[in-house]
Every structure is written in C-alpha cells, then in structure tokens.
From Swiss-Prot:
PROSITE patterns: WD_REPEATS_1, WD_REPEATS_2, WD_REPEATS_REGION. This is mRNA export factor. Transmembrane segments: none annotated. Interacts with NUMA1 (via N-terminal end of the coiled-coil domain); this interaction promotes spindle formation in mitosis. Interacts with NUP98. Interacts with MYCBP2. Interacts with USP11. The gene is RAE1. Keywords: Cell cycle, Cell division, Cytoplasm, Cytoskeleton, Mitosis, Nucleus, Phosphoprotein, Repeat, Transport, WD repeat. GO terms for molecular function: RNA binding; ubiquitin binding. GO terms for biological process: cell division; regulation of mitotic spindle organization; RNA export from nucleus; transcription-dependent tethering of RNA polymerase II gene DNA at nuclear periphery. The modification Phosphothreonine is found at T229.
Length: 368
C-alpha cells in the first residue's frame, strides 16, 4: 500500500502554525495534530536523521502498521506511506542516511523498509516478539541490533538472513538505546547491561539497577564533547534514574527523581503513581523529556536537577515521544498504553500524535 489517510478533513483545519489548534481535553496544550493517526495504540515514534532534507516522522502501532508522514515547516503533516506487519509494531528506527526504516514486531520479525521503492523485506527473526530495534553505524561495520523477549540480542547485516552475532541476555529485553560506540539494554527482573560497539559489539558492564521496579524505557545522553556518557532509565513506578558510566563521584553524580505522579484520590493512597513510558534527550540542549501513563509530558534539566515544564493532563496516557534532529519539534503520542490491562481499553477512543514547538521550552535554566 503506497498511501494511507486520504481523508481530507482530519487535522487540516486550524493547524497551519505551531500552537494554533483549538483545545479540549484530548489536546489541552493546543499542539498540532498529525493527520491520519494510527487506528490503535501507538507504541513508538522516530524522526528522520539530519542527512535527510526536511522532517519525516515514523510511527508504529498495535494496528500492526508503520506509517510515515512528512512534517512541513508550518507544522502541517502529509501522510506519505504505510507498511504492515502481522503483529503489533513495538519499535522503529532509521538508517543513518535516512533511506531505510527498520521495524520490530510482535510477529517475531524485523523488517527493512526502503522508502524510495516503498518495499519492505524481512531482515531478522526471533523466537518471541522483537521489542527493540536500532541501527548501528560503526567505522568498520554497520548493522541492525534487535532485542527480543526470547532473551537474545542479535546483530544483523541486512544482506544476510543469519545474524552476524547473537548475545544472550539474562532476561527478556524490555528497552534499549544506541549512540555509537555505546548501547544499553534493560531487561525483565531489572537487568541492565552496557555494551561497547567498537570493532564489534561486546558486553562492557552489568549494572545493578538504580530503580526498584520494572524497567520501562531508557535513553543515552552525551557529554559536552558529544560523546555518550550515561543514560536515563524510567520505570513503572514514576521514577527516572540518571546514571553515568564512569562518573568522577558516583554517589553524587548518579541520582533518581520522581515524576508522573499526582495527589491520590483517597487517604489510603496518598499519591497516584504512573509508568514512565518514554524518555527523549534534546539533541542540542541535552535536557530531556519524559512522558507517562498520567497523560502528561515533562521537560527536565538533569544538570541543574530541575523541572522546566509539565504539560496539562491529556485524557489518555502518552505512550511515546521523540525530538526531530535539531530539537525544534517534540512529537508525542496520546493513546492507551495497556498499563491498566485490557479491561480499561476503549477501542472507540481515538489515538493522536501531537507536534509541539520545543525550541525554547527545553533550554537549560542557566542559559537565557
């Protein structure tokens, strides 16, 4: 299928400029709605790399599809193409040149989608759903890394049907991130492993989790020299850990903070605690965004250890987020995240992807 979303009405009125849409409880921040959003929960978002002119957004959903939009400078979105898996799509990523998109699915496969030809081919196979997918571009090799609930991490040359390497994980892969030459994988039972990717991928260190509850999302951050130096890890218990790989003072430099919590509705539960569904670092400022089951996004300055902004509450969870390559656009998905089980799923409820102008709100506190 080469195109989707041919309806002309949704998302085209009043969305020509950032922040000019009308507001209600599904969009209290008055952000731009992406046209023709997926028909089921949105599990992952990814913007195109800087090598591609313009901005293109990819979303994977529980409707088994992957969609691509062009995001114009005005903020308006144009549906471009769509591909299908035979199970929910759990993760997506881009090749460094922007010509390919890689997709991971509950159907136990990963695919490579050539955007120029609009053809998708299977490039990976696991014995259980594939939870994470990342493109690795090293000086001496390039490959796709897939993490699965079959407790393996596999590395694939896209020209071969067999993995170039298989690494065993202590448990099911729940989340991962890659910024060369570093990868981090968080697993079930609070497993946490850092890999180095130079020459060939290898395990660098196993880390005792700084969080007491199930890992949900992880994102690597860079130092002032633009090198990966640590990661932020989010859990189902409304908490994020900031962890440096080789900090000068571990007890002082590594810390956790509470987020995505609200005052409880009764005295026996003084606080409602929600899952952190996504973490994304601003590519210019190094500040970060978190999104949660509480239906809010928050912006943070980890160096000043302060909150920069919290959104109004949406009428359903925020399930995923990402920044575009220059940090001007913050994309976030509003859809059910299954954190309360299937009985709270309402198939009549629409799913949304919103775009927000992020240029000013994520500047660190000490920079005016």
């Amino acid at each position: 299928m080469s195109l989707f979303g041919t309806t002309s009405g949704f998302g085209t009125s009043g969305t020509s400029m950032f922040g000019s849409t009308t507001t209600d409880n599904h969009n209290p921040m008055k952000d731009i709605e992406v046209t023709s959003s997926p028909d089921d929960s949105i599990g992952c978002l990814s913007f195109s790399p800087p090598t591609l002119p313009g901005n293109f957004l990819i979303a994977g959903s529980w409707a088994n599809d992957v969609r691509c939009w062009e995001v114009q400078d005005s903020g308006q979105t144009i549906p471009k193409a769509q591909q299908m898996h035979t199970g929910p799509v759990l993760d997506v990523c881009w090749s460094d040149d922007g010509s390919k998109v890689f997709t991971a699915s509950c159907d136990k496969t990963a695919k490579m989608w050539d955007l120029n030809s609009n053809q998708a081919i299977q490039i990976a196979q696991h014995d259980a759903p594939v939870k994470t997918i990342h493109w690795i571009k090293a000086p001496n090799y390039s490959c796709v890394m897939t993490g699965s609930w079959d407790k393996t991490l596999k590395f694939w040359d896209t020209r071969s049907s067999n993995p170039m390497m298989v690494l065993q994980l202590p448990e099911r892969c729940y989340c991962a991130d890659v910024i060369y030459p570093m990868a981090v994988v968080a697993t079930a039972e609070r497993g946490l492993i850092v890999y180095q990717l130079e020459n060939q991928p290898s395990e660098f260190r196993r880390i005792e989790s700084p969080l007491k509850h199930q890992h949900r999302c992880v994102a690597i951050f860079k130092d002032k020299q633009n090198k990966p130096t640590g990661f932020a890890l989010g859990s189902i218990e409304g908490r994020v850990a900031i962890h440096y790989i080789n900090p000068p003072n571990p007890a002082k430099d590594n810390f956790t903070f509470k987020c995505h919590r609200s005052n409880g509705t009764n005295t026996s539960a003084p606080q409602d605690i929600y899952a952190v569904n996504g973490i994304a670092f601003h590519p210019v400022h190094g500040t970060l965004a978190t999104v949660g089951s509480d239906g809010r996004f928050s912006f943070w300055d980890k160096d000043a250890r302060t909150k920069l902004k919290t959104s109004e509450q949406l009428d359903q969870p925020i399930s995923a987020c990402c920044f575009n390559h220059n940090g001007n656009i913050f994309a976030y998905a509003s859809s059910y995240d299954w954190s309360k089980g299937h009985e709270f799923y309402n198939p009549q409820k629409k799913n949304y992807i919103f775009l927000r102008n992020a240029a000013e709100e994520l500047k660190p506190r000490n920079k005016k």
